[in-house]
């Protein structure tokens, strides 16, 4: 499924040191990829139900100009697992083939695009109408807090990511100040939803912000990861 380990690590710009620090065998990662490939058609069905029920032909209600979606490939799933276990081993150390869907919250991704930043309020109110937002329901422990029976709610508090110097006034009435972060290189509002038994990641930004976000994700992040590990190696 994943093929040769060395080729995989090179493809996803994962240093050997990072792979070793993740603490999962190649056989375990391949088992997760195979299980995921078996389930992926179901993820597409859930994505399509979300779009049909809540997004398609509802521009006036959502405030969206356009949108796009993606489902993670098996390779990108394994890449994320490796990186997350290195970044936060305590949180992800219990992840296995049997429970990885309780840990990975962005297998289904939705990105809504706005013409103007002010249109975000329309979309935010629309989500609140269809998904409960209660702090007592937020998932802090991926295993203990995963509720099989509860659906259509926000798994964590909505979060605003901004660049330093951006104005946060538009979000102040809706998002807690602790969840407005101004130390990023991109702009976006993030939601994690529980929908039909699956976690679904929703990101909202303007068309202008989308252009910069693409540059940041595809160029800056891989470069930062490689630079970090090169620096670590030089210090040893």
Q: What are the functions of these language-model segments?
A:
Residues 129-138:
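A common structural junction motif
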Residues 229-236:
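Conserved small/polar residues in nucleotide/adenosyl-binding loops
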Residues 192-225:
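Feature marking long nucleic-acid-engaging regions of large polymerase/nuclease enzymes
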Residues 1-110, 118-121, 125:
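Charge-rich, low-complexity segments
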Residues 124-130, 205, 218:
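"Short basic amphipathic alpha-helical interaction patches in structured regions
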Residues 137-140, 144, 148, 213-228:
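Flexible glycine-rich active-site/ligand-binding loops centered on an Asp-His dyad
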Residues 155-195, 199:
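Aromatic/basic-lined ligand-recognition segments
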Residues 110-114, 200:
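Oligomerization/assembly interface segments of phage tail-like spikes and tubes
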């Amino acid at each position: 499924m994943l093929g040769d380990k060395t080729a995989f690590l090179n493809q996803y710009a994962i240093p050997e040191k990072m792979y070793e620090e993740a603490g999962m065998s190649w056989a375990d990662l391949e088992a997760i990829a195979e299980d995921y490939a078996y389930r992926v058609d179901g993820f597409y069905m859930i994505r399509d139900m979300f779009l049909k029920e809540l997004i398609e032909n509802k521009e006036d209600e959502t405030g969206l100009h356009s949108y796009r979606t993606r489902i993670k490939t098996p390779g990108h799933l394994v890449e994320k697992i490796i990186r997350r276990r290195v970044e936060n081993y305590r949180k992800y150390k219990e992840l296995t083939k049997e429970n990885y869907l309780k840990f990975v919250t962005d297998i289904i991704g939705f990105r809504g695009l706005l013409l103007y930043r002010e249109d975000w309020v329309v979309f935010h109110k629309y989500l609140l109408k269809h998904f409960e937002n209660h702090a007592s329901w937020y998932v802090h422990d991926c295993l203990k807090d995963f509720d099989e029976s509860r659906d259509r709610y926000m798994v964590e508090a909505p979060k605003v990511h901004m660049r330093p110097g951006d104005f946060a006034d538009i979000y102040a009435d809706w998002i807690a100040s602790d969840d407005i972060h101004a130390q990023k290189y991109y702009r976006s509002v993030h939601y994690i939803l529980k929908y039909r038994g699956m976690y679904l990641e929703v990101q909202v930004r303007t068309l202008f912000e989308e252009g910069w976000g693409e540059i940041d994700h595809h160029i800056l992040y891989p470069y930062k990861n490689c630079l970090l590990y090169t620096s670590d190696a030089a210090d040893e």
